[in-house]
C-alpha cells in the first residue's frame, strides 16, 4: 500500500476474523521500515493455530471512510511466497514450510480448525516432521546449571512451557516457611542483555510462585538466564525452552500430539536462525 494511492494521514486498519461477529480490532498504519519510504504497513499478531483463519481488513481514513477492503490469511501469504520464483524469496521457503507444519501441529494439539490444517497445501514430503535429533535432546537434558541453583529460603521447583499467542517459559519457585517473595528479585537476561525484572505470581499452591519469560528465536536454544537476588547474594538459573522440551520428550506421559508439536516447534525455531 503506497502513499501515492491514498492520502495516508492518520489512517487506521480495522480487522475481524471471518465468521466472528465480536468486537472488531483496530491497528495503526505505520511507515514501512523497508521499501522506498512511501510504503505503509500494519502488524496483526496471529497465533500458531490461526494460520488458515481468514482475516477481513478495511483501510479507514481519519474520518472513518472505508478506503479499501481485502481478505487474507497467513496460509494465503505463505502459499504465494512458496509459489514465487523470485530469487530473494528462496531463502525464506524452508522457514515458511516449517512454520506451516508448526501451525498444523498446534491445531491438532489444541483441537482448533483441524479441518483446515495450515500445512495442507504442502507436498507429503514437506509435511513430514522429523524427530528432534537425539544428540540435541541429550545435550539439553543434561543441564547442570539447574542443579547449581542455590539460595537460602527459596528453591527452584521446576519449569513448564506455556504455548499460546507467545511461547513462554514458566519457572516455579518454592519458599521456606516464613519467607516473603517480595524479598527476592528475578532479573531476566537474553544473550547477556538484561530484559527486565519478572514479576512473581502466586500459583495454586500457596507456597509456590512462578515467573514467566517470553521466548524468541534469540533465546530458544541458548542465552536465557534468570538471576535471583535477595539483596545480598545472587544465584543463577540457566534454562532454555529446549531444556523443557528435552525433559518432556523423555516423559512417559508424552502423547503423540505433544511429540509432534514439540518436533514442529523445534524445526521452526531451527529454521529461523539457520
Features from the language model and the residues they span:
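Short, surface-exposed linear motifs at loops/turns and structural transition points
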Residues: 1-274
Amino acid at each position: 500500500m503506497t502513499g501515492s494511492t491514498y492520502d495516508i494521514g492518520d489512517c487506521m486498519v480495522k480487522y475481524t476474523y471471518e465468521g466472528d461477529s465480536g468486537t472488531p480490532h483496530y491497528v495503526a498504519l505505520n511507515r514501512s521500515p523497508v521499501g522506498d519510504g512511501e510504503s505503509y504497513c500494519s502488524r496483526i499478531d496471529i497465533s500458531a493455530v490461526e494460520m488458515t483463519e481468514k482475516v477481513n481488513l478495511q483501510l479507514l481514513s481519519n474520518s472513518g471512510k472505508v478506503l479499501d477492503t481485502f481478505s487474507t490469511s497467513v496460509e494465503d501469504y505463505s502459499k504465494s511466497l512458496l509459489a514465487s520464483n523470485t530469487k530473494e524469496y528462496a531463502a525464506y521457503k524452508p522457514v515458511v514450510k516449517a512454520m506451516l507444519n508448526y501451525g498444523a501441529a498446534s491445531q491438532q494439539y489444541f483441537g482448533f480448525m483441524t479441518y483446515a490444517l495450515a500445512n495442507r497445501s504442502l507436498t507429503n514430503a514437506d509435511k513430514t516432521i522429523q524427530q528432534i535429533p537425539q544428540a540435541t535432546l541429550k545435550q539439553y537434558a543434561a543441564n547442570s546449571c539447574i542443579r547449581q541453583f542455590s539460595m537460602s529460603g527459596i528453591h527452584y521447583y521446576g519449569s513448564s512451557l506455556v504455548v499460546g499467542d507467545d511461547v513462554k517459559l514458566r519457572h516455579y519457585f518454592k519458599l521456606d516457611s516464613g519467607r516473603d517473595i517480595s524479598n527476592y528479585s528475578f532479573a531476566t537476561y537474553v544473550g547477556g542483555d538484561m530484559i527486565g525484572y519478572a514479576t512473581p505470581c502466586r500459583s495454586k499452591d500457596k507456597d509456590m510462585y512462578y515467573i514467566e519469560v517470553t521466548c524468541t528465536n534469540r533465546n530458544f536454544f541458548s542465552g536465557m538466564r534468570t538471576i535471583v537476588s535477595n539483596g545480598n547474594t545472587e544465584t543463577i538459573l540457566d534454562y532454555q525452552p529446549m531444556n523443557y522440551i528435552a525433559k518432556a520428550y523423555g516423559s512417559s506421559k508424552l502423547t503423540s500430539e505433544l511429540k509432534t508439536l514439540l518436533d514442529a516447534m523445534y524445526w521452526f525455531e531451527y529454521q529461523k536462525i539457520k
